Regions:
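Intrinsically disordered, low-complexity Ser/Thr/Pro-rich tracts
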Residues: 2-3, 89
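Active-site-proximal beta-strand/loop segments in catalytic clefts of secreted hydrolases
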Residues: 29-33, 64-70, 96-101, 138-142
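Residue-level marker of positions within ordered structural domains that often coincide
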Residues: 8, 57, 99
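Acidic/histidine-rich helix-loop elements
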Residues: 35-46, 66-75, 104-112
Length: 143
């Protein structure tokens, strides 16, 4: 029930910003809980972003840039954020969901709540807004 309500809210949000001359793109950035997964070998694991595009018409495109094992820090450090932000156009959405891997102890992924984690989220929001995009923050979901 919660997922249906979330999808209805997202659809309403997107349709309220729709203009006929612009295909809206939803850019997704996050970790494995959002990421697309290989379907080979009967793999049944899916991130929620894997199926999101199926809820929209051809006027709304979903680009899922979420990757397994990424934290907000590693997403930036690996250049994945730069790829996304360079594509954002006015009216596009950036769905942001990190947290699980930010708590890892290794220095390539670790961020501190109230400090580096918050700064990374603020960066995503600020840079998205600067391009005319609409940032949407999601809490980390249960794995």
């Amino acid at each position: 029930m919660k997922i249906k309500m979330l999808m209805a809210f997202v659809a309403l949000l997107l349709f309220s910003a729709f203009t006929a001359d612009h295909t809206i793109t939803i850019f997704m950035i996050g970790d494995s809980t959002m990421a697309n997964k290989s379907l080979e070998g009967g793999n049944q694991e899916r991130g929620w972003g894997h199926v999101l595009g199926g809820y929209f018409s051809e006027n709304i495109r979903v680009e899922n840039h979420a990757r397994n094992g990424r934290s907000s820090k590693s997403f930036i450090d690996e250049g994945l954020w730069e790829v996304v932000i360079n594509k954002v156009k006015p009216g596009d959405y950036v769905f942001i969901q990190f947290g699980h891997n930010d708590e890892k102890v290794d220095e390539k992924r670790h961020t501190d709540p109230g400090s580096t984690f918050d700064a990374n989220l603020r960066r995503f929001v600020k840079e998205t807004r600067a391009k005319g995009g609409i940032p949407v923050l999601f809490n980390a979901i249960v794995r």
